[in-house]
UniProtKB/Swiss-Prot annotation:
Catalytic activity of the protein: Endohydrolysis of (1->4)-beta-D-xylosidic linkages in xylans
Pathway terms, separated by semicolons: Glycan degradation; xylan degradation
Keyword Zinc: no
Keyword DNA-binding assigned: no
Protein's name according to its UniProt entry: Endo-1,4-beta-xylanase A
Gene coding for it: xynA
Alphabetically ordered keywords of this record: Carbohydrate metabolism, Cytoplasm, Glycosidase, Hydrolase, Polysaccharide degradation, Xylan degradation
Family designation: Belongs to the glycosyl hydrolase 10 (cellulase F) family. Cytoplasmic xylanase subfamily.
PANTHER family: ENDO-1,4-BETA-XYLANASE A (PTHR31490:SF90), GLYCOSYL HYDROLASE (PTHR31490)
């Protein structure tokens, strides 16, 4: 039996995720420019056909000062994508985090007017859409706007404070003017959980009824191996969002070996039990993705290998995590074999 499993896994080393799922959905990875070389480059070329700049397109990185853009890292990612017949997901225009303070201040250092902030947002969106229209197939227009710590529907942010609740609608309308054929997405975390699903549905339904040009919703999918309700919650969320006529992207998938509340720091590598549970969760959620392939058109992993993941040091400083399909050496984990085998 062991020989059969080993031989089967060796055979699967020749398989490509992107090619295996070509009749289902795009397979993407979040990347930095450093990922375009070495073992990560090899993994990208073999397994992925969609790239998301992990941080390079976020407002504070690409537009740190009013009269200065920083296109260097995205240029490298774009060049790599075009050369290798890949597409980009643009991430993100409007977010309460990683937006430089100048966006919300006037020339005197006072709070900017609604009109000035909208004007700046328009210029920012126009510049990025026109620069990347040949390679971006979807934009995360607004990110994480739904409140999840109180009973309020919308999160407090400088965007909302200055522009008002219509800032989401305005952002999508501006993006629609300049984004060409690219699809426009609202992106959020935990939006498959019942408490946030209900709120998100209300927000999106109201926006759509008012003619807001939203094409789809991004389910970030920062999950862990211990959630027993994940599959049932995910199916319900997909059906609810699809009922609004929305396309669905899985935008930031990783599966932590720790519960969010788990503060342990004693592990220097994942246990065999953790890796088996992780493989099973990946297997289960990809089965759901395939089941709903009519509405799910892209699945993106938030990273390439466990060598580099945003889950390191979060939510516990100094702790390593192992949430992706390839280990710290870039070798396939059992989770990869499980989602190739169907």
């Amino acid at each position: 039996m062991r020989c059969l499993i080993v031989c089967e896994n060796l055979e699967m080393l020749n398989l490509s995720l992107a090619k295996t799922y070509k009749d289902y959905f795009k397979i993407g990875a979040a990347v930095t420019a450093k990922d375009l070389e070495g073992v990560h480059r090899d993994i990208l070329l073999k397994h992925f056909n969609s790239l998301t700049p992990e941080n390079a397109m976020k407002f504070e990185n690409i537009h740190p000062e009013e009269q200065r853009y920083n296109f260097e890292e995205v240029a490298r990612i774009k060049e790599f994508a075009i050369k290798n017949d890949m597409k980009l997901r643009g991430h993100t225009f409007v977010w309460h985090n990683q937006t430089p303070g100048w966006v919300f201040l006037d020339k005197n250092g006072e709070e900017a007017s609604k009109e000035l902030v909208i004007e700046r947002l328009r210029e920012h969106i126009k510049t990025l859409c026109e620069r990347y229209k040949d390679v971006v197939y979807a934009w995360d227009v607004v990110n994480e706007a739904v409140e999840d710590k109180t009973e309020k529907l919308l999160r407090e942010s400088n965007w909302r404070k200055i522009i008002g609740d219509d800032y989401i609608k305005i952002a999508f309308e501006i993006a629609r003017e300049y984004a060409g054929d690219a699809k426009l997405f609202y992106n959020d975390y935990n939006n498959e959980m019942p408490y946030k699903l209900e709120k998100t549905y209300k927000v999106l339904k109201e926006l759509l009824e008012r003619g807001t040009p939203i094409d789809g919703i991004g389910i970030q999918a920062h999950w862990n191996i211990w959630d027993k309700n994940l599959v049932s919650n995910l199916k319900k969320a997909i059906e609810v969002y699809a009922s609004l006529g929305l396309e669905i992207h899985i935008t930031e998938l990783d599966i932590s070996v720790f519960e969010f509340e788990d503060k342990r720091t004693d592990l220097f590598e994942p246990t065999p039990e953790m890796l088996e549970l992780q493989a099973k969760v990946y297997e289960d959620v990809f089965a759901v993705f395939r089941e709903y392939k009519d509405v799910i058109t892209s699945v993106t992993l938030w990273g390439i290998s466990d060598r580099h993941t945003w889950k390191d040091n979060f939510p516990v400083k100094g702790r390593k995590d192992w949430p992706l399909l390839f280990d710290v050496n870039g070798k396939p984990k059992e989770a990869l074999y499980r989602i190739l085998r169907f």
